[in-house]
Design a protein with these regions (language model features):
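Cofactor- and metal-binding active-site motifs of prokaryotic enzymes
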Residues: 3-136
Length: 136
């Protein structure tokens, strides 16, 4: 039987890795490779070797979409597990909205995550959306 199809949204994921030691140049390189200016959100896994102040400032200056970033002991790069550098992932879709929340210190993370999830569920109920759509 002939069935009408409805177009679905496409999720585009781009991955990049840099070993550039200068935070500003590393973030600029990743932003270009990830096409971050058009992304719905960006995830960054950063080596603890970067000074966090300059790294955070470079991210805020360069990537103007929501970013979730963390330090990591190592990242999966083009050559497998690597130490140093930054690995990034950009996600782009008309159906995706990313809302980062600071979880600090991490020992408070669980209770903060529960509070955030409850607030998102409350907002979803108020706007008659499913919680999964809001949390996604």
């Amino acid at each position: 039987p002939n069935m009408a199809t409805t177009p679905t949204s496409t999720l585009v994921a781009r991955r990049a890795h840099t070993q550039e030691p200068d935070a500003a140049r590393a973030v600029a390189e990743l932003a270009a490779e990830l096409e971050a200016k058009d992304a719905s959100g960006v995830l960054l896994f950063c080596s603890g070797e970067y000074a966090l102040g300059p790294l955070g400032a470079a991210i805020a200056r360069t990537i103007r979409v929501p970013v979730a970033a963390c330090t990591a002991a190592g990242q999966l790069g083009p050559n497998g597990f690597e130490h140093g550098g930054i690995t990034g992932l950009s996600l782009t879709s008309t159906d995706l909205e990313m809302r980062p929340h600071l979880l600090s210190p991490l020992t408070l993370g669980q209770s903060q995550a529960v509070s955030i999830a409850r607030e998102q569920a409350r907002r979803a109920a108020a706007s008659r959306q499913s919680p999964e759509a809001v949390l996604a």
